[in-house]
Amino acid sequence: MHPPPPDAGVAMDFGQNSLFGYMEDLQELTIIERPVRRSLKTPEEIERLTVDEDLSDIDRAVYLLSAGQDVQGASVIANLPFLMRQNPTETLRRVLPKVREVLHVASVEMQLTAAVSFLTILQEESMSVHTCAHSFLQVILLHLEHRDTGVSNAWLETLLSAVELLPKETLRHEILNPLVSKAQLSQTVQSRLVSCKILGKITNKFDAHSIKREILPLVKSLCQDVEYEVRSCMCRQLENIAQGIGAELTKNVVLPELIELSRDESGSVRLAAFETLVNMLDMFDTDDRSQTILPLVKSFCEKSFKADESILISLSFHLGKLCHGLYGIFTPDQHLRFLEFYKKLCTLGLQQENGHNESQIPSQIVEQEKKYTSVRKNCAYNFPAMIVFVDPKNFHMELYSTFFCLCHDPEVPVRHTIAICFYEVSKLLNSGVHLIHKELITLLQDESLEVLDALINHLPEILELMSTGGENSVQENKFSSVPDLIPALTAAEQRAAASLKWRTHEKLLQKYTCLPHIISSDQIYYRFLQRMFTIMMTNNVLPVQRAAARTLCIFLRYNRKQEQRHEVIQKLIEQLGQGKSYWNRLRFLDTCEFIIEIFSRSFFCKYFFLPVIELTHDPVANVRMKLCYLLPKVKSALKIPADMHLLQQLEMCVRKLLCQEKDKDVLAIVKKTVLELDRMEMSMDMFQKKNYEKDLLDQEKEREELLFLEMEQLEKEKHQSDGRLASDKSFEKKRRDSRTSTQSLSKNLPISVPGPSSSTASTSKEIKKSKLTRSQSFNNQAFHAKYGTLDKCASKSSTLAHTSSVSGLVRTAMLSLTDDSFRTRNASSVPASFSPNPVMPSTSRGPGNTADPKSSGSKDAQPRKATLKSRKSNP
C-alpha cells in the first residue's frame, strides 16, 4: 500500500469547513428571503380599478377620465375614434371636455396617444368642418408648443392633417393670424420651427395675392432667422410656397432667397438650399437654369470635395434629377466635366493611397467609409439616368468601366443597388445589351444572397432582352457568346438552396419558368430538370418544393423530345406517385394540380388520371385528404361523352371512400367533396356558352401539344433529308461531269427524271421550313396558366386550324410522290407521343366525334385499361 500523501487530513478539514460555510450562507439567505406577492395588485387597487359592468361606453369613459387611474384614462383616449364612430354626439358633448381637462396634466405617453387618436378621427372624415374647427382644432393648437419635442411634433402632424379639412376663413383666423406673433424672434425656437412647417402647408389654400401680402413677409423673416435650424426648416418649405405663388413670384422672391441660403455659413442650410433647388428645377425657365442654377450646382460640386463632404451624399442622390433638369443646358466641356465628376463619385473611397490618414482615429475611419459607401450606392441608383445623359450609344466608351466597378464594388449595398437597376440598364441599352453579359454573370455569382435576390426580381425580362437584343442571336443557341450563363444559374440556385433564405430560393425557382424562352430544351433537360426532381424529393421547405414542381411542369410542357417527356412522366409517377414516402406522394398531387393548370385536359387524362385515382387507397390519411381536395379539379378535366368511362371510375372511387373511409377527418372532407362534385357541370365535347372560354383555351393547349410533336417529327425528317441532299449533290456533280461531252446534244433533247417534280419538291420544302420556323417561334410565346383574353385565343385557334387544314391537304396531295418517307404519312395520323406506352400507365380517350381534335388521337373502339404497379407505402 502506498502511504497517504502529506497534509491529506488538512485538506479534508478544509473541504468540510467550506461545505459548512456554504450551508450557513444558504441559511442566511433563507432568513432574509421576502415573501413573493401572488398578485400584481392589492385588493384595494383592484377595487379602485373595478368599474360597473352595466355602464354604457360613454358613461364608462366619463367615469374613467374623472376618477380612474392614468392607464385607464389613456385607454379611453386610445378608444376615442371608436366612440366617435359609435356615438359622435354624446362623445363630443360629454367625453371630449373631460379629455381636454386630462390633457392639461397628462403624461407624455397620454399626450402621444391623444395626438394619434385625434389624427385617426380627422383622417376618417366622419365629422363636419364646423365640428372639426370648434371641437378639435383648439385642443390641437393648445398643445403645439409642448415642452417635449416628440409630443409637439405629434400634435403638429395632427394639425397639418386638419389643414386639408378646414376652410380658408377658418385657417386665416385660427391659424394664420396667430402665426404672425408665433414667428417673431421673441418666441422660442420650437415655436418658430412649427411656424415654418405650418406656412409651408397652408400656402396652397390661399390665392397668390393673399400669399404675397400675408405669407411672404413671414417667409422672408424666417429665412433670415438667427438660428440655422429655423433657416434650414424654412428653406425646405420654399418648394411648397413656390407652387402656390406661380412662376413670376417664384423667380422674383423665392429664387433670391434660395441663392442667399445656398451661401449660408451653416452646412445644413446649404444642403437644404441645394435639395430645394433640385426639386424646383422644373419651375424655372431655361435662362434661370443656365445663368443662375448651373453655376450654383458647379460650385456645390467643387466644394463638396474640397471643404464640405457633408453634401456629397445628397449630391450623389440627386444626380439623376440634376441630369434631367439641366439636360440640354450643358456645353460639351461642362457635360464632360459633370460626367467625370460622376465617375469620380462612383469610385470614391476605393482609390486611397497607403490606406487612411494616420491622424484619423478608427471611429472616424469607419464613419468616413460609411459615407463613401452611401455615395457609391447613390451613384448606382442614378446609373440609368446617367446612361440617358451620355446617350446609350456612347455607353461602351463612356460608362462601361464605371458599370464594371459598381458591379464589382466591395460593399454589398452598392452591388445590391446596381442589381436592382440592372433591368433598367438593359432596357436602355436595347441592342447593346450584349455589352453587359459578363456583369450579369458576375451578379448571378455574387456571394451575397441580397444581391441575387435583387437581381432575380426581373431575371426573366433581363434574359429575354439579352436573348433577343443582340443582332446575332439564334433561337437554339441564343447565349453562345455567354457560355457561363447556365453554370451561373445553376450555381445561384445551389447557393440559395444551401442558405436559410428559402424565400429567395423559391423566387429563383419561380423565375426559372422563363428558361424555355431562352435556352434549348436539351440544356434544360440535362442541367435544370433533374435538379427540380432533386428539390422535390429532398428539400424540406414546402413552398420551395411546390415552386420546383411548377417549374418542372413548365419544362415538361415545352420539352421538344418525346423520349425525354416520357422519361419525366414515368419518374413523376414512379418516384412521386408510387414513392415510399407519403411526403413524395403529397408532392405528386401538387404536381398533378399544376399539370391540370398548365397542360390540356387530354394530356392529364392520358397520363395522370389513373395514378391520381389510385391514391384513394393510400394508407396515409393526409394523402387521401389532399386527394379529396383535388378531385373537383380532376373531374373538371373530363369531357363527356369521350371520358364517360373515366367519370365512372372517379365515381366508383368516391363511393368507396364514402363506404370504407375510417378516418373521421377524411370522411368529413369526402362528404363536402361529394356535394361539390354533384354541383359541378361537366364539360362537353362541343363548346358550351358557359365554358366557351375555358374550352377554347384547352383546345389551344392541346393543339400546341400536338404541334410540338409534329414539329419534332419534321425536324427528324429535315435532318434525314439534309443527309440525302448532300449525297444527291455529290451524285449530281459526278453525273454532270460524265455528261460534259454530250452537253450540246442534251440541250436539244428532253430529259425525263423520275421522282417528284421540282415545283412539288420546293413546295414540300417550303411547308417544312414554315413549320420549323413556327416551331422555333413557340418558345417566344407566353406560357402562363392564363394564356390571354378570349379574342387572342380565338385568333390563335383560327390560325392554327387554317395551318392544320393546309398541312393536311398538302400531305394528302403528296401521297402520290415516290419518296417513302412521305408515302407512309397520313393526314389523320396519330402523333407518336400520344400512342399507348407499355411502360407508363395511361388512359385513352373514349370514342367520340371523329371531327373533334381530341378524339382524333385514338381510334380504339373500347377504352384501354392500364394497371398500375402494386406498391406498399410506408406511412
Swiss-Prot record:
Transmembrane segments: none annotated. Residues 866-875 have a biased composition (Basic residues). Residues 740-764, 825-859 have a biased composition (Polar residues). The modification Phosphothreonine is found at T799. Residues 718-773, 825-875 are annotated as: Disordered. Residues 718-739 have a biased composition (Basic and acidic residues). Residues 686-730 form a coiled coil. HEAT repeats lie at residues 215-253, 254-292. One of its GO terms (cellular component) is cytosol. Pfam families: HEAT. The keyword rRNA-binding does not apply. Keywords: Coiled coil, Cytoplasm, Phosphoprotein, Repeat. Its main location: cytoplasm. The keyword Kinase does not apply. The modification Phosphoserine is found at S777. One of its GO terms (molecular function) is protein serine/threonine phosphatase inhibitor activity. It is found in: Cytoplasm. InterPro entries: ARM-like, ARM-type_fold, HEAT, HEAT_type_2, PPP4R4. GO terms for biological process: blastocyst hatching. Putative regulatory subunit of serine/threonine-protein phosphatase 4. Serine/threonine-protein phosphatase 4 (PP4) occurs in different assemblies of the catalytic and one or more regulatory subunits. Component of the PP4 complex PPP4C-PPP4R4. This is Serine/threonine-protein phosphatase 4 regulatory subunit 4. The gene is Ppp4r4.
